[in-house]
Amino acid sequence: MATEEKKPETEAARAQPTPSSSATQSKPTPVKPNYALKFTLAGHTKAVSSVKFSPNGEWLASSSADKLIKIWGAYDGKFEKTISGHKLGISDVAWSSDSNLLVSASDDKTLKIWDVSSGKCLKTLKGHSNYVFCCNFNPQSNLIVSGSFDESVRIWDVKTGKCLKTLPAHSDPVSAVHFNRDGSLIVSSSYDGLCRIWDTASGQCLKTLIDDDNPPVSFVKFSPNGKYILAATLDNTLKLWDYSKGKCLKTYTGHKNEKYCIFANFSVTGGKWIVSGSEDNLVYIWNLQTKEIVQKLQGHTDVVISTACHPTENIIASAALENDKTIKLWKSDC
């Protein structure tokens, strides 16, 4: 169920974009975004764990400790369907590039591949010996990468559901896995304090990123252009790395993150922002270049565990834990 936020007249009028006299091709990042709450999506009966927009921009998928995946309209928050089949809670969900398939990672030690339109489970991926915590398709969507509390990273064949490679990746639970934009590399992060870059084809570790300190790494992903890595650590810090040089370029702070694996994002549809949830129940938005906090979104009543940025519009989805259980859709003019 989506409830819509009603705006006072004056604010709605003020939110109309004004025509710009100098509409140049490459716009500099605006000073600040103005994300406002548009819809609250209620339906999950336990903590929400992950939210992801479909690559075609039509849908939002959510996963939860209630063992369910729910599909919602990306623009209006309208509930579309529930997808069920896992025996225990789900920690992550991810879309295929054509927006037709989903993969989910569950505490039942399996991943499942789903046909979204029918809601049917096409394959169950078995092999991990502990909770599966994170998953992603490669851009070609013929492979899936998963990370588990069994400390391994696995690469799976989408068509057959067979495990192609098991990487003895880390010495603690794996918190995130992500392919770069051509699918040639995988990045993984772990509570062992490391980020590792893997060659997809060979399964070889190409690079290990180590900071001076080594707090648990709770999330990692490649930037859209594939040159950088965004990594979250459980010392209330997000860092942007040039991984080829092994150098930290930017540090983003001000939020609270010491306990949970909170997703972070690059927002690139308008201004260039970094977006993350936080343990103080807020969504934080930073200017990517200047590292300053440009907006904090208030409304959730528990830890904001997951945020997602729409592929083409200035829309953020956020999701929160057990005391809240809702998903919120926020929109900005820039």
Swiss-Prot record:
It is found in: Nucleus. Changing T208M: Found in a patient with childhood apraxia of speech; uncertain significance. One of its GO terms (molecular function) is histone H3Q5ser reader activity. GO terms for biological process: gluconeogenesis; negative regulation of transcription by RNA polymerase II; positive regulation of DNA-templated transcription; positive regulation of gluconeogenesis; regulation of cell cycle; regulation of cell division; regulation of DNA-templated transcription; regulation of embryonic development. The record marks D107, F133, F263, E322 as: Important for interaction with histone H3. Changing F149A: Significant decrease in interaction with KMT2A. Residues 1-12 have a biased composition (Basic and acidic residues). Its main location: nucleus. Changing E322A: Strongly reduced affinity for histone H3. No effect on interaction with KMT2A. Interacts with PAXBP1; the interaction is direct and links a WDR5-containing histone methyltransferase complex to PAX7 and PAX3. Interacts with HCFC1. Component of the ATAC complex, a complex with histone acetyltransferase activity on histones H3 and H4. Component of the SET1 complex, at least composed of the catalytic subunit (SETD1A or SETD1B), WDR5, WDR82, RBBP5, ASH2L/ASH2, CXXC1/CFP1, HCFC1 and DPY30. Core component of several methyltransferase-containing complexes including MLL1/MLL, MLL2/3 (also named ASCOM complex) and MLL4/WBP7. Contributes to histone modification. May position the N-terminus of histone H3 for efficient trimethylation at 'Lys-4'. As part of the MLL1/MLL complex it is involved in methylation and dimethylation at 'Lys-4' of histone H3. H3 'Lys-4' methylation represents a specific tag for epigenetic transcriptional activation. As part of the NSL complex it may be involved in acetylation of nucleosomal histone H4 on several lysine residues. May regulate osteoblasts differentiation. This is WD repeat-containing protein 5. It comes from Homo sapiens.
